Amino acid sequence: MLEHASMTVKFIVDRGVSHELVRHRLFSFAQESTRYCNYSADKFGKEITVIRPCFLVDGSILYADWFQAMQYAEKFYFTMLNDGSTPQEARSVLPNSLKTEVVVTGNMREWRHFFRLRAAGETGAPHPQMSEVAVPLFKTVRGYMPELFGDILLPDVK
């Protein structure tokens, strides 16, 4: 009867991770839309918010490259708005690292499937940024519902 119990989770992730999430088609999603968000508004602090990928180390040359790319993306997003673009048009320069909020609802069978793929890596190594959110969520959920999730083992938890 796993299909009759559900769980809803709010993820705060980057757009790249959100694209991984929505591949789980049996979930239901509500996601913040860059089409209607105008990041030049006070509501957003007149800036874009990005999430540093977990594989970039602060102080490294790769981090510096990424950070500069994020600054350029923000600069040209606002330039396009100032030059007359709508937020829908200007969003074309926004990076995958842009923060988004996604509310995900699914039945317990689908959450088991999600954790097997995205936390335990049963079909191969999951995307590192997806693991970064899936593993802590799995550990929390397994703690509350060991009967439902106790048989799923993480590579580092035997």
Predicted regions and their residues:
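Family-specific signature for flavin-dependent thymidylate synthase
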Residues: M1-K158
